[in-house]
Regions:
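Non-catalytic structural scaffold of enzyme domains
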Residues: 7-254
Length: 254
């Protein structure tokens, strides 16, 4: 368990969260940040958390229309709302908006924690070499994960077109509204097994934060699961504590 790095005589950092994309995961981020922080600081303290919960329909419309500049402006304004509210740093509690993360980060006056960079660092630290990627179709068809992982000499393998369509449909129609079905869980795990059988993946990225609500095992058919929600949370709490997440492999887990 990592040691406490805060005391009552210090000014505690405030974390800002862009949430609502989707709502179920925003609740999960809040709970996991609280749990991990309290386990790291058993003095009974709790972190300052500022949540800016959005109506996900607006950014989803921009994504569907490929209006990425408009999306970056929209999310940048919401990050500024967090900064004005007193956040010292922030994160976007979703994978897909990281399509425009670099633009938002350049414009932001507070630091932002990238779920993509944190996940790529975690994959490298785990010694993984070939990763399956599951997420929305926007994430699976984007370059941000392959580029971040290629920089660490890790290859990304995508599901086939039919599997991608299935994952995206179940993600939007079931997971975003919080519907968890055992048959969907089984099909998702079989997709991971299929990737292992045909491409010899040794890890799989849950490249959609809602996926962590249905795939909770650390391994699936011998494939290590990279829960991007948990990785992002660990990076955020590390920032709160003034620590390096990768330097602390023994974080308490959920």
């Amino acid at each position: 368990m990592p040691p406490s790095r805060c005391n009552l005589g210090e000014q505690m950092k405030r974390i800002g969260i862009i949430g609502g994309i989707g709502p179920e995961t925003t609740v999960e981020y809040y709970r996991r940040i609280l749990d991990l922080y309290r386990q790291s600081n058993p003095d009974g303290g709790a972190p300052y958390i500022i949540i800016n919960s959005l109506d996900m329909r607006k950014p989803l419309e921009m994504l569907t229309a490929n209006k990425l500049e408009e999306l970056a402006t929209f999310l940048g304004e919401e990050v500024e709302t967090l900064a004005r509210a007193g956040a010292d740093f922030a994160l976007v509690a979703a994978n897909t908006p990281h399509l425009v993360f670099d633009t938002i980060a350049r414009q932001s006056r507070i630091p932002l924690i990238s779920i993509v960079e944190a996940t790529a660092d975690a994959a490298k630290a785990a010694g993984l070499k070939r990763l399956g990627l599951l997420g929305t179709r926007f994430t699976m068809q984007a370059s941000f994960y392959p580029e971040a992982l290629a920089a660490r000499e890790i290859e990304v393998i995508l599901p086939n077109e039919e599997e991608q369509a299935y994952i995206h449909a179940k993600y939007m129609d079931e997971l975003v509204p919080g519907i968890i079905l055992p048959e969907t869980h089984d099909r998702l795990t079989n997709i991971i097994k299929s990737l292992k059988d045909r491409a010899q993946i040794d890890g799989a990225i849950l490249g959609g934060t809602e996926l962590s609500l249905i795939l909770r095992d650390e391994t699936v058919f011998g494939v290590q699961i990279l829960d991007t929600t948990q990785i992002h949370v660990e990076a955020a709490v590390a920032q709160l504590l003034g620590m390096s997440a990768n330097a602390n492999p023994n974080w308490p887990t959920r």
